[in-house]
Amino acid sequence: MTNALKLTALCNRQNVPVLDQPQLIYVLAEASPGSAIANVRLPLNFSLVLDRSGSMAGEKLHTLREAVKAIIDQLSPSDIVSIITFENKTQVLVPAQPAADREGLKRMVDGIKDGGGTVMGPAIREGLNQVSRYASPNYISRIVLLTDGEATDKLEASMHEADNAGARGIPIIGMGFGSDWKEDFMQEIADRSWLADPGSEAGRVEFIRNPGNALQVFQEVLQSMHVVAKQVTVTFRMVQGLEA
């Protein structure tokens, strides 16, 4: 497929004279998707980690449920999804599986009720466990944490799990709910999952005002993850007399 990838190269010198001594030349190569695969992405492998604690009661939880259903509608059967809920305890609502039955997934989400505290660390750990089951170069793996950030367990527990996610190459995307959401806390979790310094804002965290806002954020995340090739190797073949 000749129009699958576009490859352009730029050299810092247009002409290379013949000299007795070695010369240093810089080449910038840029690969971009061609028209045939411009909208193609690798399948997703992600876990939705949902806060259903007492602090999420009312409008927050309603918005969360509708936001999650809007996200589910964007999935294809080749995507892998798991759904984790948490309050005092962590529950695997949907174990990691292909997103073939979107209507069934949405019915599960509709049944989520609020109650209890916000023990977040174990929930992130379970989300990481579920994503790790399918993690491979053939998938784009992520954890999506939806919460108001009102953790009632030790904050260090969530940070530790974010570090573990970063060590496995599985970033956490944060979606915050409610005007009192803990943005700094969620940002640090996201940053740590990228193995970045706290405050660097390397990770993605967004405040979700309504379900449509969540859908927009998710679509932007999808667009940024349109990976069509991984672990690419570039080979230079030189003419006789030249070495790279």
Q: Over which residues does each language-model region extend?
A:
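Exposed acidic/Ser/Thr-rich ligand/metal-binding surfaces
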Residues: 8-231
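Surface-exposed beta-strand/loop patches in extracellular or lumenal glycoproteins
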Residues: 231-237
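Proline/serine/threonine-rich low-complexity linkers at boundaries of modular beta-sandwich domains
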Residues: 1-6
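A generic structural motif
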Residues: 32, 237-239
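Short aromatic-acidic-glycine turn motif
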Residues: 94, 240-244
